[in-house]
């Protein structure tokens, strides 16, 4: 406020924009002298009540009247001269101008703080006491004084009467703000009054009218309005401010909790209600959002409708994609659950079993690839085969299918679990979702996974058959050999291999070829000793050891189709190097039967050569090495043993045959490995 004298208070510089209240008051009463004294007393009273000065009314009156002719140079003189009247001045003699009010909070500030741009200091002098305001209430400060034009000024000359008059006014004083649209004064202070309650007003979008303000809170509002505190109002204002702030904080806290509950229900609860019951069967992480994409399925047993729920970064639902159409009516409201998280109802369990069984059937002759490109599962006509050489395959899972986008691995027919591999996430009879959930995804996700795991344990037993136990015995055999494949008396089919962490040698997976047998094994070399072969067997065979090893009559799928009973009635004999045969594949076999032996084979015999010794090649096998039978006459039913080409020990006739569909492999016989494995398996209880 440049240009103001430093000893002049702010109130001294206020200039009313309208004619002086003293002029109006003198014209109403008719006696200038008495009206001036009343006006000075009224201004002194108003200043003491509004501005917060504690000076006595009588002392203020005496000092103001004695110093009414003292003017200081400044902006007020120029404005007063221009307006043509003398503005009432404020006594600043007892005001400390050099006191720092910010240091001592008990000191009273005589200045008026105005923060609203629409409020002018001159409007404060436009008191409704001296103006005709129909909207003002009839009170000593907001209405008109009971002064009539004919009132004698001597009636107010008595000091006792005047003291009693103003004492009554001070005792019954209360600030009643009029309607905010009635005057410019309250229009300009609307923003100031709503500062402390801005947060509450913004949420509730409601404004408190002047009639709803209680008298007990009017002093608080007026003191906060002017930014000044008096001694008698200091404690009351502080207490009221604390109470008001506490109540507002309570309201804010309640509303924040309400909004948080709404947000949590939208983020982790049921999606938008559409009238149907849904069961969550999977979720998947989405790039750019910490909330996963959720997948739901209708809980009706005959309904195949699914939906996908996308969420924003804040957890709000942004998109719901439906797949299919409902073939049933909406369930009653009392049976709607929004979303069945744990799936405790029997209907959901039956539906899940039907879906899983249908998935088993539909997965045949298909090839699926997981989201991480680590598992490449090749499925045969009636069984699953794992064939990924570079990634980590889940050897304990019986199949992998994809329902929509989430990757769900169902362990229903497998009993092979690999504890050495940290990458294998599948467990016996459990559901492993592609989304790990960051350590469980919270308490709800852990309970949900546990519930699904318990349900699928029973389902795995049903799918695998009553003759299989959920937890199969495990046998680990470690031998020393130069070859990876050890002969243990059973026939195995390799269905995959993988690279194991910390071991440069791959791990190979095999499955017993006997129908109905689910025994599996994996073979790997030790990382510290390349000659040490570790073979781990999972499960127990439900059949006897095959009669012969490395034979084709019982291997693969031939063991159960009755070829041993003489399925081929026509035999081709080879005599003196002459033969006649239809074209066939490289590894096809020609079986010759006679009346005495169920197993025989076309071999090249020269009757005039006598008992042959050594080896010869079968005419019917191109590029394959076959064994001759020394001392065997043509047509002889029982044949003696012949020396093994490698171990020089007697073997049976069926040893000379190869399995159908298998490549020729050199498999050394390990009596120690076979005997150890057979001894261990013989100790296990029969199934």
Curated annotation (Swiss-Prot):
Coiled coil, from the record: none
Biased composition regions of type Polar residues, renumbered to the chain: 199-208, 219-249, 354-379, 590-599
Region span, Disordered: 197-276, 324-384, 416-453, 537-599
Binding site for Zn(2+): 298, 303, 326, 328, 512, 517, 541, 543
GO CC aspect terms: nucleus
A UniProt-annotated Pfam family: WRKY
Alphabetized InterPro entries for the sequence: WRKY_dom (IPR003657), WRKY_dom_sf (IPR036576), WRKY_plant (IPR044810)
Tissue: Low expression in senescent leaves. Expressed in both the unfertilized egg cell and the pollen tube.
Protein name: Probable WRKY transcription factor 2
Organism, scientific name: Arabidopsis thaliana (Mouse-ear cress)
């Amino acid at each position: 406020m440049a240009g103001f004298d430093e000893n002049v208070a702010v109130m001294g510089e206020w200039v009313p924009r309208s004619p002086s209240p003293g002029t109006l008051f003198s014209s109403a009463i008719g006696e200038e002298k008495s009206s001036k004294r009343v006006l000075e007393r009224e201004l002194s009273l108003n200043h003491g009540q509004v501005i917060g000065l504690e000076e006595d009314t009588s002392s203020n009156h005496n000092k103001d009247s004695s110093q009414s002719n003292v003017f200081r140079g400044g902006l007020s003189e120029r404005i007063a001269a221009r307006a043509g009247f003398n503005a009432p001045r404020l006594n600043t003699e007892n005001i400390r101008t050099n006191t720092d009010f910010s240091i001592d909070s008990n000191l009273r500030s005589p200045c008026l703080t105005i923060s609203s741009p629409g409020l002018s200091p001159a409007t404060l002098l436009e008191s409704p006491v001296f103006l005709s305001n129909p909207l003002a209430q009839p009170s000593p400060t907001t209405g008109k004084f009971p002064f009539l034009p004919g009132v004698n000024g001597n009636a107010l000359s008595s000091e006792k009467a005047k003291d009693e008059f103003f004492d009554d006014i001070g005792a019954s004083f209360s600030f009643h703000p009029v309607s905010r649209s009635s005057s410019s004064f309250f229009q300009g202070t609307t923003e100031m009054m709503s500062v402390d309650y801005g947060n509450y007003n913004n949420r509730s979008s409601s404004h408190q009218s002047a009639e709803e303000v209680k008298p007990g809170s009017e002093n608080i509002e007026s003191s906060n309005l002017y930014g000044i505190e008096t001694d008698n109002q200091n404690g009351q204002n502080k207490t009221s401010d604390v109470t008001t702030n506490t109540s507002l904080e309570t309201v804010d806290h309640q509303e924040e909790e309400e909004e948080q509950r709404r947000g949590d229900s939208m983020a982790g609860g049921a999606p938008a209600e559409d009238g149907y019951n849904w069961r969550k069967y999977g979720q998947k992480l989405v790039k750019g959002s910490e909330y996963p994409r959720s997948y739901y399925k209708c809980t009706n047993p005959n309904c195949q409708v699914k939906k996908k729920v996308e969420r924003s970064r804040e957890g709000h639902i942004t998109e719901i994609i439906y797949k299919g159409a409902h073939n049933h009516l909406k369930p009653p409201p009392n049976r709607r659950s929004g979303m069945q998280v744990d799936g405790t109802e029997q209907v959901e369990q039956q539906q899940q079993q039907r879906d899983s069984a249908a998935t088993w059937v539909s997965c045949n002759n298909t090839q699926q690839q997981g989201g991480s490109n680590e598992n490449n599962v090749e499925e045969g006509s009636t069984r699953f085969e794992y064939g990924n050489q570079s990634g980590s395959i889940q050897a304990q899972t019986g199949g992998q299918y994809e329902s929509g986008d989430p990757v769900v691995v169902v362990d229903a027919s497998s009993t092979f679990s690999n504890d050495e591999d940290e990458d294998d996430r599948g467990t016996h009879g459990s559901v492993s979702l592609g989304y790990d959930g960051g350590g469980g995804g919270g308490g709800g996700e852990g309970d949900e996974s546990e519930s699904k795991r318990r349900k699928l344990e029973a389902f795995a037993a049903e799918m695998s058959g009553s003759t299989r136990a959920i937890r199969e015995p495990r046998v680990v055999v470690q031998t020393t050999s130069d070859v990876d494949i050890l002969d243990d008396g059973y026939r195995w089919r390799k269905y995959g291999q993988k690279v194991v962490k910390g071991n440069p040698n791959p791990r190979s997976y095999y499955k017993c070829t006997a129908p109905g047998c689910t025994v599996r094994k994996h073979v790997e070399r030790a990382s510290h000793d390349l000659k040490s072969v570790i073979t781990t067997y999972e499960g127990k065979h439900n059949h006897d050891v095959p009669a012969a090893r490395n034979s084709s009559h019982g291997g693969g799928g031939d063991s159960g189709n009755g070829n041993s009973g003489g399925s081929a009635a026509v035999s081709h004999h080879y005599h003196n190097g002459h033969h006649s045969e239809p074209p066939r594949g490289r590894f096809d076999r020609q079986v010759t039967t006679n009346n005495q032996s169920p197993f025989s084979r076309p071999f090249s015999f020269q009757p005039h050569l006598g008992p042959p010794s050594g080896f010869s090649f079968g005419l019917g096998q191109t590029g394959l090495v076959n064994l001759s039978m020394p001392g065997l006459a043509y047509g002889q039913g029982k044949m003696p043993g012949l020396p093994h080409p490698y171990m020089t020990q007697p073997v049976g006739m069926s040893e000379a045959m190869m399995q159908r569909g298998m490549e020729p492999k050199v498999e050394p016989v390990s009596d120690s490995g076979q005997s150890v494995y057979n001894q261990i398996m013989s100790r296990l209880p029969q199934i």
